[in-house]
């Protein structure tokens, strides 16, 4: 999901979540502080917080910072029976949604590895790079995750299964595209 809420790449595996999941996710994340205050004022529990968002760099992917209580959405949360798990890397959200009960740490690690592999292949992880390498990104996702079950997430192991060449996007070009 792009910083404006646009879906860049979408792959459904189990079809157990609503079609408009990206819109719901982006609205929840963007207005997390307001949603949290509304839930507290109403006395309801519209979402269960599973963990605290951590945007520290992992394996060179991610935005530095984090650690402050700024009402940002946690990395994993539940809303109306749908589990939303995400990592944010260079302004791009890598998101997983499911109704199944799954280990948040396992899914978050998978999302970090997906972000790292895309960065390894494209040179940078940005909205522009993912858009220009959409076919390559779909091919990577198909090799890394099969019917919702993670397979290989190693860049070296994927090299013999990936046949598309990346369209190289310079970091200065992708930075201008983010403006």
Language-model features, listed with the residues they occupy:
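Acidic, low-complexity cytosolic segments
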Residues: 1-179
């Amino acid at each position: 999901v792009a910083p404006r809420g646009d879906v860049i790449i979408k792959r459904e595996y189990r079809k157990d979540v609503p079609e408009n999941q990206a819109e719901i996710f982006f609205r929840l994340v963007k207005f997390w502080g307001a949603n949290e205050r509304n839930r507290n004022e109403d006395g309801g529990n519209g979402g269960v917080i599973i963990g605290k968002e951590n945007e520290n760099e992992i394996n060179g992917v991610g935005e530095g910072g984090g650690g402050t209580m700024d009402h940002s959405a946690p990395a994993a949360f539940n809303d109306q029976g749908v589990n939303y798990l995400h990592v944010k890397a260079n302004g791009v959200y890598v998101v997983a949604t499911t109704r199944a009960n799954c280990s948040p740490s396992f899914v978050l690690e998978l999302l970090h590895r997906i972000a790292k592999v895309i960065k390894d292949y494209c040179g940078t992880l940005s909205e522009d790079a993912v858009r220009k390498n959409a076919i390559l990104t779909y091919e990577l996702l198909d090799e890394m995750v099969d019917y919702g079950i993670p397979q290989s997430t190693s860049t070296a192991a994927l090299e013999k299964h990936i046949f598309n060449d990346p369209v190289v996007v310079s970091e200065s070009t992708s930075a201008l595209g983010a403006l």
